[in-house]
From Swiss-Prot:
Protein name per UniProt: Uncharacterized protein in nifH2 5'region
PANTHER family: CBS DOMAIN-CONTAINING PROTEIN, CBS DOMAIN-CONTAINING PROTEIN CBSX3, MITOCHONDRIAL
UniProt keyword Calcium, yes or no: no
Highest taxon, organism lineage: Archaea
SUPFAM superfamilies per record: CBS-domain pair (SSF54631)
Domain CBS positions: 57-96
InterPro entries found in the cross-reference section: CBS_dom (IPR000644), CBS_dom_sf (IPR046342), Diverse_CBS-Domain (IPR051257)
TM region positions: none
Provenance organism: Methanobacterium ivanovii
Length: 96
């Protein structure tokens, strides 16, 4: 299994999806400081591809407003142990 084969498995075809979805490597939690064989990574990507969104989605989504400070947003993320914080408007609609 080659590096380009792995990249083909995780390729996202729509740039707009990157605004809403975590990076593929975030899903498989690729160890940065360990050497992992490409075949093992490819197997992890294949497994991740078979998981349904509903199985891993956050049930209670934490949000912030666009006028919130970075420090307030970071504190909210830390408090609720989340690494994504969608920004919503006054009608709770996603700000793009």
């Amino acid at each position: 299994c080659k590096r380009r084969d792995i990249m083909k498995l995780i390729e996202v075809h729509s740039p707009n999806l990157n605004l809403l979805l975590p990076a593929p490597f975030d899903l498989i939690e690729l160890p940065v400081r360990m050497e992992v064989g490409y075949e093992e990574i490819a197997n992890d990507v294949r497994k991740a591809a078979s998981v349904l969104v509903g199985e891993i989605m956050t049930k209670k989504v934490r949000t912030t407003k666009k006028d919130a400070s970075i420090s307030d947003a970071a504190a909210l993320m830390d408090k609720h142990n989340v690494n994504r914080l969608p920004v919503v408007d006054e009608n709770n609609k996603l700000v793009l």
